[in-house]
Amino acid sequence: MAATELQADPWLSEKLGKPAFNLRKGFTEFSLSLLPSSPAFVSAKVATTEHEACLHLQRQGFRVIDVGLQYRGKPNQFEISKIGQSFRTARNEDEPAVCQIAAEEFLLNRFHEDPEIPLIISSQIKRDWVANFFLGKRGDVLLVATVQDEVCGFLLLIHQGNQFVIDLIAVKSRFQQQGIAKNLICFAWKHHRQSAQEILVGTQISNSASISLYSHLGLELK
């Protein structure tokens, strides 16, 4: 059996106001006595096939918050298909608009779906997450979508070997259902793929819009 591995998350600890850890392995060996302090926040990503681990963690007080999905592959579309939409790399002056979108539009994720985390904190986590790009602490490329010079969406990319990872993607509510997210991904693949051979992106099983988008682009469930 693998020994329990708890990895401290200083950034998330600051946001939550309590020690935060990621449980990396040794799920069936975990017990609350291993925590250096309490109360604390501990998250774990467990494969749905690891039934014993899931049951053990729930007995230790864990709750299932979401079920994550990963998609990968090459998009089957490359052209921007909507007139009136423009796409470019982000500028420093885009930070307020991008951060506002991040704070308001991410509702289906492990922070917002956790009833123990207040909405104001969940929103601040997403705001600060993308703000770290402007501080040079997160991501390699940030792209924005504009309509009539208004920033209406963004995509944060991380280059990881032969993949480019979609770290965050969001579109303002009143601009949704207009193909902006799809076009952002196509623009990124066409102009910022570098040596990447495929896209890797995660979402939640509750996010039907994202599942439809990635499937429509020809990405496959990992």
Spell out what each predicted region is.
Residues 18-28, 47-48, 169-177, 203-204:
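A short, internal acetyl-CoA/4′-phosphopantetheine-binding micro-motif in the GNAT/acyltransferase core
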Residues 24-93:
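Acyl-donor-binding surface of acyltransferase catalytic domains
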Residues 28-36, 168-171, 177-190, 212-216:
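Conserved acetyl-CoA-binding loop-helix of GNAT-fold acetyltransferases
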Residues 37-48, 163, 192-203:
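Conserved GNAT acetyl-CoA-binding A-motif
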Residues 46, 138-159, 172:
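Conserved beta-hairpin
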Residues 49-64, 178, 182, 205-222:
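Conserved active-site alpha-helix within GNAT-family acetyltransferase domains
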Residues 51-56, 118-143:
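Active-site rim helix/loop that mediates acceptor-substrate recognition in acyltransferases
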Residues 86-102, 106-109:
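A short beta-loop-alpha structural element at the N-terminal edge
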